[in-house]
């Protein structure tokens, strides 16, 4: 079973990102715009309950916070990914750290750069052209964040929510 842990921004931010993703992201139909807290990982079905319990613990230790999204960035020359930059708040950093320590120990492929992907798998020329145009536009959004989501991947490659975790002390 393949799982991932993400934050979904508001519908308004998703709509702005999807307006670009339709043209520049071949993964557009597989998953809504999101901020990745933990990249996809494989696990056994019997571990799911322990994972869910650990995520409840992490959510309870994390206060709700404000998400700040703005400007367009790129991971070039490592890869031709375009994204909306997301401010790295203490809460986002804490969530990411908790999901790579202790129970979730796993080698990181990249350092944590919170972002919303708006384009990927672009040729060098297309990447340079689109990045140049988008950097001239003014993007800035903010919204309160009070939850994150555990996703699982279906056989057709799409992702769906398994469970949602509310930040702060949950009502059990």
Curated annotation (Swiss-Prot):
GO molecular function (one): hydrolase activity, acting on ester bonds
EC numbers, comma separated: 3.1.-.-
Active site: 34 (proton donor), 115 (proton acceptor)
Motif, HXTX 1: chain positions: 34-37
Key words of the record: Hydrolase
Motif (HXTX 2): 115-118
Superkingdom to which the source organism belongs: Bacteria
Listed SUPFAM superfamilies: LigT-like
Extent of the signal sequence: none
Family note: Belongs to the 2H phosphoesterase superfamily. YjcG family.
Protein name in the entry: Putative phosphoesterase BcerKBAB4_1135
The organism of origin for this protein: Bacillus mycoides (strain KBAB4) (Bacillus weihenstephanensis)
């Amino acid at each position: 079973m393949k799982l991932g842990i993400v934050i979904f921004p508001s519908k308004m931010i998703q709509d702005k990102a999807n307006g670009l993703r339709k043209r520049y992201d071949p993964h557009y139909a597989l998953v809504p715009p999101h901020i990745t807290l933990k990249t996809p990982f494989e696990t056994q079905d019997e571990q799911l309950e322990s994972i869910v319990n650990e995520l409840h613990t992490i959510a309870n230790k994390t206060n709700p916070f404000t998400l700040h999204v703005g400007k367009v960035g790129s991971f070039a020359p490592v890869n031709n990914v375009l994204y909306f930059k997301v401010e790295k708040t203490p809460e986002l950093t804490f969530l990411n750290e908790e999901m790579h320590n202790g129970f979730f120990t796993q080698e990181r492929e990249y350092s944590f750069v919170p972002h919303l992907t708006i384009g990927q798998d672009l040729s060098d020329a297309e990447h340079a052209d689109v990045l140049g145009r988008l950097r001239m536009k003014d993007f800035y959004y903010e919204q309160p964040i009070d939850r994150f989501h555990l996703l699982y991947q279906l056989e057709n490659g799409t992702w769906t929510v398994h469970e949602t975790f509310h930040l702060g002390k949950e009502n059990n």
